[in-house]
Amino acid sequence: MHLFKKVYSLLLIILLTNCEAKAAILVPNLIVDINQLPSKNYDIGPFIISWNAQLLQFDITNQSDLSKSIWSSVQEKGFIHGAQAIDMVEDSRGSFVFEEEIIEILSNQSIENIDLINNQLVIKGKVYNNAVQTAYTLIFKSNGDNQLNFDVNFENNTFNRVYFTYSAEEEEAFYGFGEQCSFFNNKGKKIPIWVNEQGVGRGDITDPIINAVLGLSGGNETSNYISVPHYISTSNRSLYLENTNYSVFDLTESDKVQIDTWSSHLVGNIISGNSPKELITEYTTYSGRMRKLPSWVGEGAIIGLQGGTEKLYDEWAALEEKGTPIAAFWVQDWIGQRTTIVGKQLWWNWELDNDRYPNWDELVDTLGKKNIRLLGYINPFIANIYGQKTNIRRNIFLEARTNGFLVKKENGDPYLIKQTSFDAGIIDLTNPACRVWIKEIIKDELIARGLKGWMADFAEALPYDAVLFSGESPKDYHNKYTEVWMQINREAIEESGYGDEMVFFARSGFTQSPKYSTLFWQGDQLVDWGQNDGIKSAMTGLMSAGISGFSLNHSDIGGYTTVTYPIVKNYVRSKELLKRWIEMSAFTTVFRTHEGLNPDKNYQIFDSDETLEHFAKYAKIYKSWRFYREQLIDEANSTGIPVIRHPYLEFPNDLKTQDIVFEQFMIGSEFMVAPVLEKNKVQTNIYLPNGRWINLWDGTILSSNGQSFTITNLVDKPAVFYKENSTNGIQFRNNLIDEGLAE
């Protein structure tokens, strides 16, 4: 019966989702007395807002280019309407499903006043139906030379839905919204803005038994760790929200956009720019830009391993024998490892396990003499492991509960989140004393132990009905939680005095996470070839997140999520997948391995001499373009432009680049990379924009008129080309020749 309920619930969710996706966008009727409000232009700093009384339309331009509209309402239709609704939100282990019951829909809009007051355009009127109404105010004001702020507020806040509707062009593509992993162009989709567990499979797993077991944890094509209310479009338009509550960008119709925010107050900014890179640079003045990585990160591979001191020494020796450049060892099980129903997980009690890693100080010192760092792991959960783990010195869960540092339920009890086969409390980051306490744990238990960085995991699971110390609504704080988690980690390394030399990498993110985090990684991809949750999704998400300011990002080499249930199809890492992920990752910002959720089932780099040599080769290739990577990291820090780029950013006038989803990417402005992302393939297609391109491996030249080429004989390498006359391309190729890695 329990299984039947799960299957029924899953089918119901799918049905509701599909029905919702087919619903037409409701555009409100607009009532205006044009005799009282005739056509007029309003100067708002560098912007001109034009009211056309005949078309019943607002249009906004920047005075730097009066021919280009950066925002316009739909002709003869309203642009604001509202509703009163009841939230119906279900969550499980950081996965959420949002539904609502609409009580009243206010489908008519009136405009009663348009006034220029203190260089702000103030528009007032009502949204209403035959029975109820509320007054609204919309204020436009300049936010610098390239941003126009808009602020919509309902007088009666029982109407807790604001809908903001405006026009789009038929062929306009929309990019961004954080780390969208299933598609790069979001046109035709509804994009929810909510930091989430991305889910297992996200639609790639078709086995009904697995999906029934997963339930909400299966995810869907729009559930993502990094969710940001921001986009750029191929019409060189851009917009972002300042709201932190749940919202939806409805792009399902070709000629309009509708933003649905679950609030009575909507605040955002419209960005003006002449190119996609200009739009990103302007946006990141708000989101923040990522600081430069410590130089040691680029010196070689970051090796993810578990198993203790002796195993680390053994695997280090094997890597050294192959001449593998190593930047760090990442030992996520520094706190000890537990076996759960899904595989190998960790004891979430943030102190060193001296039994698993004896002679720790000696290990740190020995690695340090070879210029190799040691990295660890932490997250904002705390598990009560008393009586389960025998060698604990601190009961961190007890400390948190005693001091009131855990998020609570309405009855005052700690809100325990079900993980796999254990529960964990989530620390309350709205409590200033808790923030000091967790920072001291990071300083005392991680930094003082010699760790030079760590994975700062999770931060997606704050429940919708939680009770917070500050009294803030979790509906507004949920997305902020990940930003604050990044901020605390950043403050800990800065206050320790080692800030420039340390790096932590996070998987979750909201609008201003790039301001605080030193690095991102893409979370838990399935160890598969899928487009929704596999190697392809990692490539799509990497390029998508770069649009929204996540300029330094990478994925686990080989993927992470392993599915090993009896009877049904298993998902375990193959040697071929591991090798292809190695090849792809060598051309991204960070080259880091992960054993995966079930290390004994997944193929590892140490499982054969062939894969160990392959890994060593690509670690050398990764190191060989360090000189250019550092230039791009500097550029990301000063402009917000990502290191790894979708080709559209460099070739915005080439319409063919808009069709690229995961198939290829650019390193900076000079290299085009097309990894092999299909099983049992040794060739791939690569689109090269107009010009002459040089093959990195053999120096042959391809002259392109803006066309695709089939590149063959890619048994153990991706297709990589650089622009003719690129000095960085020449240096990279010469470095490879010196290493014996290119002809």
Summary of predicted features, one role per range:
Residues 403-451, 486-527, 593-611:
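Alpha-amylase-like alpha-glycosidases and glucanotransferases acting on alpha-linked glucans and related
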Residues 2-10:
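Sec-dependent signal peptide recognition
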Residues 9-17:
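Bacterial N-terminal signal peptides
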